């Protein structure tokens, strides 16, 4: 359902510059743990490549300042705070199922998709 919604959005979705590494890591860890085969991983990556996803080129520039402050303020991982920082900076809605990140976004006044 999330992928279908992403395909339907004209402008696509913005993600932090670390997104591809996070996705690749999750898929590879599932291969390493024998939960999925490499064919599944590769097919998932091919499907994701078709989505209108835009990588933010400024994620790292904010890592040691605003992203870190958000992580500290809301007790988030720096990785999760990067998504919140991006939503704040670009003034875009945030799509996440993570309860703690959703709460932090609400406190920061960020619109949540699916809310």
Each predicted region: which residue ranges?
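Active-site neighborhoods of divalent-metal-dependent phosphate/nucleic-acid chemistry enzymes
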Residues: 53-100
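Short, well-structured N-terminal submotif of metal-dependent ribonuclease cores
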Residues: 1-19, 30, 34-43, 108
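Active-site-proximal, substrate-binding regions of enzyme catalytic domains
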Residues: 24-56, 64-66
């Amino acid at each position: 359902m999330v992928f279908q919604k992403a395909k339907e959005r004209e402008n696509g979705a913005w993600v932090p510059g670390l997104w591809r590494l996070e996705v690749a890591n999750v898929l590879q860890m599932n291969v390493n743990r024998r939960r999925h085969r490499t064919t599944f991983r590769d097919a998932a990556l091919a499907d994701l490549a078709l989505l209108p996803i835009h990588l933010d080129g400024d994620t790292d520039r904010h890592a040691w300042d605003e992203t870190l402050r958000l992580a500290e303020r809301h007790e988030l991982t720096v990785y999760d705070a990067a998504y919140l920082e991006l939503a704040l900076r670009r003034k875009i809605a945030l799509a996440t199922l993570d309860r703690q990140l959703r709460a932090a976004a609400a406190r920061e006044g960020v619109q949540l998709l699916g809310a």
